[in-house]
Amino acid sequence: MKFIAPAALLAVLQAASASPVDIRTSTTGLQVTLSQVDNTRIKAVVQNTGSQEVTFMHLNFFKDASPVKKVSLFRDSMLHPILSSCNDEVKFEGIKYRVQSSNLSDKVLTSLAPGASFEDEFDIATTADLSSGGPITIRSQGTVPLVKDRSIKGRIPYTSNELTIEVDGAEASKIGTVGSKVKRTELSGCSGDRGAALETALQNAVSLANKAASAASEGGEAFTTFFKDDSSSTRETVAARLKAVAEEAGSTSGGSTTYYCTDTLGYCEQNVLAYTLPSQDLIANCDIYYSELPALADTCYDQDQATTTLHEFTHAPGVYSPGTDDLGYGYDAATALDTDDALNNADSYALYANAINLGC
């Protein structure tokens, strides 16, 4: 893992241009209706189908202007036999990030009364390579963070219709993914206060990840709280990913990732702590990583710099493949996941490492 100062990056475009609440019932949630606008441009109408007003954080969801994963894309091998096996998911090439769990700004919150809706248009070619064209099936489901008193207090489920479109590959290639538009020139390492803070965070991440890996190998109450299953295979999977994170965090001149001290690509929205571009194994910290987070938390399940760095490392497939997603932010949402989703959730590892470190 190499860490880089902001001045060392030339990011340019290529010439191509209180009590936890868990709303999880079949009659309550958000319904997403997907439709095609033009080729790879998609419109989503998000409606509150429940009987009460809800407020949620729309970061990493529809209405987020950054290239986040709003939908899943699939190819059918019967129609595209050379490129994929049956119903293969198209690789996501956008960004993933960790957000603050409290002190949330109005700018990242959406409130919907019963029956109310909002629209969002986005281009799926910015987060997936669709240059080969052909039929693509699109759908979306998951949960979005429920917010009360400006803090994440649970989750709201959402689901969509299934939409199949015919993609013009030549047109899609003109859009290009986020990763394809990034050129990097590495000139020097992080320096100053931010460089020192990141070095400390990396050292702490090594310690936390190693402790958590050892604890995961043994299982126990904290393990089942986050990962539900105490089987040897689950313990081995968690331990292996955490060991890989420790190894990567301890390698500041090599490894698989490049770590930037500041927002190199311009995706640090309000309340975003750090982000990862998995297709490039690139990680970048945002300003509030330094201004809002302590080096290490002294309270169970609070956020800090070390676990935020650990969170981002789990997103990077170069550290441990496949990289994780963001399926549940914060303790309430993370501990409500089943085993499969917990193993694929970045915050589950970060929160578990915090729990082991503090003896929660």
Swiss-Prot record:
InterPro entries in alphabetical order: Fungal_M35_metalloproteases, MetalloPept_cat_dom_sf, Peptidase_M35
Protein location: Secreted
- What does the Swiss-Prot or TrEMBL cofactor note state? Binds 1 zinc ion per subunit.
What are the GO MF terms of this UniProt record?
metal ion binding; metalloendopeptidase activity
Name its co-factor(s).
Answer: Zn(2+)
Q: Which reaction does it catalyse?
A: Preferential cleavage of bonds with hydrophobic residues in P1'. Also 3-Asn-|-Gln-4 and 8-Gly-|-Ser-9 bonds in insulin B chain
Question: What domain of life does the native source organism fall in?
Answer: Eukaryota
User: Glycosylation annotated at which residues?
Assistant: 103
The EC code for this enzyme is 3.4.24.39
Q: Does the keyword Hydrolase apply?
A: yes
Active site annotated at which positions? 312
Give the UniProt record's GO annotations in the biological process aspect: proteolysis
Mark which residues the record calls propeptide. 19-184
Question: Which residues hold Zn(2+)?
Answer: 311, 315, 326
The cysteines joined by S-S bonds are: 190-261, 268-286
Q: Where is the signal peptide?
A: 1-18
What keywords tag this UniProt record? Cleavage on pair of basic residues, Disulfide bond, Glycoprotein, Hydrolase, Metal-binding, Metalloprotease, Protease, Secreted, Signal, Zinc, Zymogen
Principal localization?
Answer: secreted
Q: Name one GO cellular component term.
A: extracellular region
Which sequence ranges are marked TM in the entry? none
Q: Decide whether keyword Protease is in the record.
A: yes
Supply the PROSITE patterns for this chain.
ZINC_PROTEASE
- Describe its function: Secreted metalloproteinase that allows assimilation of proteinaceous substrates. Shows high activities on basic nuclear substrates such as histone and protamine.
Family membership, please give it.
Belongs to the peptidase M35 family.
* Protein name from the UniProt record: Neutral protease 2 homolog AN3393
Species source reads Emericella nidulans (strain FGSC A4 / ATCC 38163 / CBS 112.46 / NRRL 194 / M139) (Aspergillus nidulans)
Q: What is the lineage of its organism?
A: Eukaryota, Fungi, Dikarya, Ascomycota, Pezizomycotina
